[in-house]
Amino acid sequence: MIYNCNFTVDQSNRELTRHGTTAFPIACYLDDLSQAHVCWHWHEEWEAGVVMEGEAILSIGAQTCTVSAGNGFLVNSGVLHSYQAKGDARCRLHVLVFHPRLVGGSMESVFYQKYVLPIAENRSMEGFFFHKDIPWQADAMAHILHAFQTCEQEPPYYELHVRNALSDFLALLLTHTSGVQAKGNAKELRDTERVKQLLSF
């Protein structure tokens, strides 16, 4: 099932929406940024999406980037982010919001410990922007869109297909971002925490 983006936040700007169910913790959203922007918020889930039409200005932690149609993004767990359309033209995004345990299973599992934690607990990797002209990043976005379309259509065994697509997405990300994971930018991390504190007032 696909949802329109609509949510509330608490005093710390943590999103209060429940994404999916405990058994299948994922929700798919069709965001039309020409109708309304997505204000600053954060949640413990990962958020991955692709711009389908127009251009979006995406702010993820301390990074801000204009993302055009065909390109995408990932927001890490617990990171402040906001989106808005660039200009007055129509801007649509396909977005997945899913808990890391969907691909990692229990926190004691090898999947969670070996593959989820290196990204989820890495504060130096607040987010990532994907570009369609880079082959592995185009493949990563194809996995995001496959998971989105499978959620939309709900064919037999769709939960398995969604989990497989997201596992393949995670494997690509881990393979190609080891250098990014190793680098920390202390100033960006401090700036992000300051913004989070300011928004809570």
How should each PLM-predicted stretch be described?
Residues V38, L58, G105-S106, Q181:
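Short acidic, gly/pro-rich beta-turn/loop elements at beta-sheet edges
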Residues E47-V50, D139-H143, A165, L172:
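Amphipathic, well-ordered alpha-helical segments in soluble domains
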Residues V67, S106, P156:
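Loop/helix-junction capping segments adjacent to catalytic residues or to phosphate/diphosphate-binding pockets
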